[in-house]
Amino acid sequence: MTKMKRRTFVGLAAATTTALSMPSIAFGALPRVVVIGGGAGGATAAKYIAKDSKGAIDVTLVEASKRYYTCFFSNLYLGDFRAYGSIGHNYYGLAVNHGVNMVHEWALSVNNAAKKVNLGSGESISYDKLVISPGIDLKFESVNGYSAEAQSKMPHAWKSGTQVQLLKNQVKGMKKGGTFVMVPPPNPYRCPPGPYERVSMIAHQFKKSNPTAKIVILDPKNKFSKQGLFMEGWQKHYPGMIEWISAETHGGIKKINATTMEFETDLDTFKADAASVVPAQRAGRIAMNAGVNNGDWCPIVPASMQAQADENIYVLGDASVSYTHLRAHET
């Protein structure tokens, strides 16, 4: 969950080149960096390690999907400001323009001692340095009554793709004057302002086509990122439409029922016509399998993004954790 800048990857490429120069000479082959995860972090890392090393490093990107849909800008799609296709990207340019080796398979596990990534096909790829950018996994069990099955009725849409399309269809299809319930996640999680940006886009849709609709936010927190700005904006642009209820006020979500679309709290039982539940989160599973996590997240050395648990592994993006990342949820 640490912001990434190009200079970080330039430094990583330079550091990796230096660190691997001796082994590569000994074995008569280029040093190899394997990147797991083809999202924004992983794809950017693969690009600039390949580009800035000027061919001195063999770069392989392991990503199961052949097309990546961004979570950022998904709210613009939700609000009808962008077409769905515009947030999708392929990996053609990485391979053709920068010589990155693309492996479209699942990375199942990492053998740290042997420095190998084990793939879903049963094969493995060796590495000298490993970059993991696994994104997040959702802790469905963190909300009583929510589950992987319930996401088809109450989409989290916290991983882009079909979930975001489902959420948009439900928002647009909600009955006139109905109630939309949003349950944001507890800290820490991917993109602290994200749930409230999403509420804003949903309110934008309702203002156009369903102006008597209501939005209820049942928050597991007592404050949220950029709260003052959001509250001011909601009052200005969507007066009377959005109600934010803190954990202190509703007393906690005791249970949800995806069949009846009900949310039971100490304050009341809320009935939704459409809903989005975003559960608690943790680093993507491959980071756990690589043993670079401490609990739900992966501690890193902020200056280099090197995993604290393994000097040969770097962890990027939402899966990584540092003091700076924790502070981001408070501002």
Report the location of each language-model feature.
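AMP-binding/adenylate-forming core of the ANL superfamily
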Residues: 130, 275-276, 314
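N-terminal secretory signal peptides and thylakoid transit peptides that target proteins
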Residues: 1-20
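Glycine-rich beta-alpha-beta "Rossmann" dinucleotide-binding loop(s) and their flanking helix/strand
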Residues: 136-160, 267-303
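Conserved small/polar residues in nucleotide/adenosyl-binding loops
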Residues: 324-331
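Beta1-alpha1 glycine-rich phosphate/pyrophosphate-binding loop at the start
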Residues: 27-101, 186-227
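Short FAD-binding loop at a beta-strand-to-alpha-helix junction that anchors the flavin cofactor
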Residues: 307-323
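Glycine-rich dinucleotide-binding loop and its adjacent helix/turn
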Residues: 134-209
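A Rossmann-like FAD-binding core segment of flavoenzymes
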Residues: 97, 101-109, 114-117, 125, ...
